[in-house]
């Protein structure tokens, strides 16, 4: 009955590739680098994924940026920490959803913390989804892509997997 707690972790390389894709999308939205620079960064990271780790760290990005002569040498990797965090959270959520689908979980409940203020975009999602049961495939992935300036969306939205017959 509770076999979904023993699902094996997905291939770490696949998770890292998802994270690279998400980082590429978020960086394009943030406009901190040009599309050409972002493309080179993503290409380098795909070619040289981090070994023995399940996510990207600043050193990986720094090494990739060092290979691109179009990026100023004084570019600080710390300036894209938020984008890296969002990419990591989104990739982790995608892997988690894939595991949930494999074990038959089809519905989730999205809970926003009432004591926090959310950005305008997240407020719309809050009105639509807060506390409601939604199909897993229809639920948005938090943090939203547009919320790279909003810390509340990355930390204070909880997506709970629901088991039919127990939770709903």
Residues covered by each model-derived region:
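Domain-core detector
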Residues: 1-151, 159-168
């Amino acid at each position: 009955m509770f076999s979904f707690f023993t699902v094996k972790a997905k291939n770490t390389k696949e998770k890292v590739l998802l994270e690279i894709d998400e980082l590429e999308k978020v960086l394009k939205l943030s406009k901190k680098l040009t599309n050409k620079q972002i493309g080179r960064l993503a290409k380098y990271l795909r070619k040289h994924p981090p070994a023995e780790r399940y996510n990207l760290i600043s050193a990986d990005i720094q090494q990739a940026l060092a290979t691109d002569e179009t990026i100023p040498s004084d570019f600080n990797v710390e300036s894209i920490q938020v984008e890296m965090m969002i990419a990591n959270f989104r990739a982790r959520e995608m892997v988690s959803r894939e595991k949930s689908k494999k074990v038959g979980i089809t519905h989730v409940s999205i809970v926003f913390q009432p004591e926090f203020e959310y950005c305008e975009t997240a407020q719309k999602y809050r009105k639509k989804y807060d506390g409601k049961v939604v199909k897993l495939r229809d639920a948005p992935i938090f943090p939203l892509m547009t919320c790279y300036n909003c810390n509340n969306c990355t930390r204070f939205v909880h997506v709970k997997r629901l088991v039919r017959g127990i939770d709903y």
